[in-house]
Amino acid sequence: MGVFSNLRGPRAGATHDEFPATNGSPSSSSSPSSSIKRKLSNLLPLCVALVVIAEIGFLGRLDKVALVDTLTDFFTQSPSLSQSPPARSDRKKIGLFTDRSCEEWLMREDSVTYSRDFTKDPIFISGGEKDFQWCSVDCTFGDSSGKTPDAAFGLGQKPGTLSIIRSMESAQYYPENDLAQARRRGYDIVMTTSLSSDVPVGYFSWAEYDIMSPVQPKTERAIAAAFISNCGARNFRLQALEALMKTNIKIDSYGGCHRNRDGKVDKVEALKRYKFSLAFENTNEEDYVTEKFFQSLVAGSVPVVVGPPNIEEFAPASDSFLHIKTMEDVEPVAKRMKYLAANPAAYNQTLRWKYEGPSDSFKALVDMAAVHSSCRLCIFLATRVREQEEESPNFKKRPCKCSRGGSDTVYHVFVRERGRFEMESVFLRGKSVTQEALESAVLAKFKSLKHEAVWKKERPGNLKGDKELKIHRIYPLGLTQRQALYNFKFEGNSSLSSHIQNNPCAKFEVVFV
């Protein structure tokens, strides 16, 4: 009959010893055995419940939350113990179906021990040198010494080793640096000045350039200085220099092209004395912004740019530079230079960022270099190793979300700061999966960890700010920095919700400013 056959109490016409009754039903007031029988009958469901719970605990088939659910369902369905189940509000009071218990369960069920421990088996890159002091993932560079590298510089690598190209030169001079061409040639990892490359290697950094150094008096009679030595550049910079000179703008030229001043000077110190600096690149290529531009910022000399079409993305403020996009722009730019040179108040506005601080967008860009490109390469490779393991059919199946009864769903996502390797757990409620809720949850998580932004030790003192974290961008892990900083955004909360639902245990990166 099964273990639950007697939950309904004694059958009519039988004593508790199961002998047929004679002379009708015995009187309850005159039969002690009937009283004992009723008490035992009431206790029987409790005994059965304890047996069931013991079995469940022994087999380890249910987690703590499921065990509570089973117990609740059993008691609420047994009329001898509870005739009416507790209301949902009461369940919350006694700890049932809570978000907290879901989070604890997800932390346990979603935890993973990866097969490769990078502290014991670091990322290994053949060639190059370890030119950083610290990295959030263990990584070594050098000769192979019998070990198969994770990656190596150059083509022709053995199976299992990814090939890397790294260069800070323009793709117009070195076509192999073009992202599409590098892929066609067989490079797995591209490291160039392009923010669309796998691991960008830009000219900018807080460590190399004292960008926030104070502005010095402009003492030179000429209002602009030029340092141009390659007179055969693949753009119109030489023509632009000549055209500016023809507009009666006095320019001191220290380079090999139209030199009229001795070039044996400290470039940055010389630029500090001029109101304008001709930051003319040798090619007009997206993201190709060299020291010419950043040295101008250090000097507090307004850069006049010939170069990348997206130079505004590299500027500390929208009015901090002048841009000659084509030869047609020379005349209006010259007119603007003359106006600013003659109006101190207007000119000072172009350097306002030196006193008030650059834009968050500029800080987010330069902060990327707070982690050395070689370390970012190691993080890129280690992330790839883990992603490949996660895609394996033998990888642990994780729930990544939790709902108890009719309560709201709790989603488990993972977030790390750009420039770091390990992920942190963040939980979102299904009814409030919004961008605002995601930012709030991420801030709360990292604040609870007393997290220090990766750029904290690199920025100049007046830009380090207080201990409060501010989010500039949150984006799905795996985007390029061009996508992350400029192109990507969720198209509303429904887009974010769909991403989380379609990507169990979704991973994100956050950029703090």
Curated annotation (Swiss-Prot):
The keyword Membrane applies. Residues 1-39 are cytoplasmic. The chain crosses the membrane at residues 40-60. It is a single-pass type II membrane protein. Coiled coil: none annotated. Pathway: Protein modification; protein glycosylation. Residues 25-34 have a biased composition (Low complexity). GO terms for biological process: cell wall organization; protein glycosylation. This is Putative fucosyltransferase-like protein. It comes from Arabidopsis thaliana.
